[in-house]
Design a protein with these regions (language model features):
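FIC/Doc superfamily catalytic core
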Residues: 1-194
Length: 194
């Protein structure tokens, strides 16, 4: 959980306690996911669930930790879509599906400004183009500063496409962390906080 994109303000006390057990090595990530699922399956009969918003945060945080702990990675739009499906299965009815309508949203990360996202009918083509451009990047010939700028440009482009109706920022963050791992980096959520 130390590597997950986890915001304690959005998470339940139950998740935090369960995460501590995982960090201490007392339980596996599979056990964490099972415990979180059981916790919310029985929430209707319990009075100690803090508020409705924690279920999504808790389930997704556990799934992020699981995905980041896996060695597998494929530099493809399909892998990005699969991350979205795994993060939000059972949370959103559209998990793992490219959005089917145009959207605009005020983004907290931009102090409430809006962004022009890719048109829904061009999402797949735009993803394919951005991924093909990134695949052709010759990182060994770049300085560290050039490489960082190039990766940032690629990641911000994927985010601006906004391929999903919801969950784009977390999906892009997890994909980015997996991608950076292929370069030998061990990123954690602090790179997304500042």
């Amino acid at each position: 959980f130390g590597d997950s994109v986890l915001y304690k303000a959005d998470s339940s006390e139950y998740l935090i306690k369960t995460a501590e057990q995982h960090i201490e090595g007392d339980i596996t990530i599979t056990e964490v996911k099972d415990l979180i699922d059981s916790y919310y399956e029985s929430k209707g009969v319990r009075l100690d669930v803090e508020h409705e918003g924690t279920e999504e945060a808790d389930k997704v945080a556990a799934r992020i930790t699981e995905i980041l702990s896996e060695k597998s990675f494929s530099f493809t739009p399909d892998f990005l879509i699969r991350i979205h499906q795994r993060l939000f299965c059972g949370v959103y009815g559209h998990a793992g599906q490219i959005r089917q309508r145009n959207i605009s949203k005020k983004e907290w990360i931009l102090d409430g400004d809006t962004v022009t996202y890719s048109g829904y009918d061009m999402i797949r083509q735009t993803l394919d183009y951005d991924f093909s451009q990134e695949k052709g990047t010759d990182y060994p010939s770049m300085s560290a500063d050039q490489a960082i700028k190039r990766i940032c440009k690629f990641v911000s482009g994927i985010w601006q496409i906004h391929p999903f109706a919801e969950g784009n920022t977390r999906t892009t963050a997890v994909f980015t962390m997996k991608y950076l791992q292929t370069f030998g980096f061990k990123p954690d959520n602090t790179i997304f906080r500042d």
